Regions:
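Domain-edge interaction signal
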Residues: 1-151
Length: 151
């Protein structure tokens, strides 16, 4: 089991009015999976293992946690204080939470593959994920490069 309470606290800080209806919305489940994956990439160890699935990174352990806490997840009913490290990640997540589900899919896939800073990231994603538009992938890569940086 991971630390879903930390993930939810970070999301609440990043976007206080965020709602994730994981019981009824596939897109909301996808968004939460991608948010947590990106938090991990930002250096926050939440204890979830991710595998590659059709729509990008997926953690069965995270799915178990959010289904077991569906009401807490939906309204972000959490009152936990963030540590300094968590607050830094939450600040960066403010831009991430504004991405659409398909943009999140593109960004998380690029991160999973290690392509964020590659010149041909757009072409690579287009080849493996042809259902994503060029605009979605470009926006995702742009946000990713701003938020996570390139080394």
């Amino acid at each position: 089991m991971g630390n879903i309470d930390i993930a939810l606290s970070v999301l609440k800080y990043a976007k206080p009015d965020l709602r994730l209806d994981i019981k009824n919305s596939f897109d909301d489940r996808l968004r939460l999976q991608k948010y947590v994956f990106i938090m991990e990439k930002l250096g926050l160890n939440l204890g979830y293992d991710f595998n590659e699935y059709l729509r990008g990174p997926y953690s069965p352990g995270l799915a178990m946690d959010y289904y077991g806490n569906a009401d807490t997840v939906k309204e972000l009913k959490i009152s936990r204080e963030l540590t300094n490290e968590e607050r830094k990640v939450a600040e960066k997540m403010k831009e991430i939470v504004e991405l659409t589900p398909t943009e999140l899919e593109a960004l998380s896939y690029v991160l999973l593959k290690g392509w964020l800073c590659d010149d041909d990231a757009l072409v690579n994603v287009g080849f493996y994920k042809p259902h994503l538009t060029v605009n979605e992938v470009e926006r995702a890569i742009g946000v990713g490069r701003r938020v996570l940086g390139c080394k």
